[in-house]
């Protein structure tokens, strides 16, 4: 992706990339934003929704954040039932709720292959952001 000028408020962006973007909105509050989606990895629609939601939210958690809300994104074949899609969405909604967040909307398109995921918005204190390039293995004695 082409590099672009970044505002000072963009604490984590493309260079170097990490699990999610982080944007400072107040001295003690930064927004964590991520998007993940992929084809189902299990046959159960509810489990697929829960797995997709957990995967997307894990990027917010990896940055040290808490989940606020999410938007679902799905690609759905016309030959699969709407009931299966609703079950998939229910799995995602339940998993986001379990993490303390809420699903606030989303978007669905017709495609040949099913895909599902979420854009997740979280919050973190700027002093508590966890970065991949700053991780250290804990030393253990004894």
What does each model-identified segment do?
Residues 1-62, 128, 135-142:
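N-terminal glycine-rich phosphate/pyrophosphate-binding loops that anchor nucleotide-derived ligands
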Residues 25-40, 66-142:
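Glycine-rich anion-binding loops of enzyme active sites
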């Amino acid at each position: 992706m082409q590099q672009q000028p970044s505002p000072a408020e963009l604490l984590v962006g493309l260079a170097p990339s990490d699990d999610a973007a982080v944007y400072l909105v107040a001295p003690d509050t930064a927004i964590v934003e991520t998007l993940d989606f992929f084809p189902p990895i299990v046959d159960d629609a509810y489990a697929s929704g829960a797995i997709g939601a957990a995967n997307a939210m894990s990027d917010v958690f990896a940055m040290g954040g808490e989940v606020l809300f999410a938007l679902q994104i799905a690609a759905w074949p016309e030959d699969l039932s709407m009931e299966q899609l609703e079950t998939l969405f229910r799995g995602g909604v339940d998993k986001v709720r379990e993490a303390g967040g809420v699903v606030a909307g989303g978007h669905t398109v017709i495609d040949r292959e099913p895909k599902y995921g979420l854009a997740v918005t979280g919050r973190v204190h700027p002093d508590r952001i966890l970065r991949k390039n700053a991780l250290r293995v804990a030393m253990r004695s004894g």
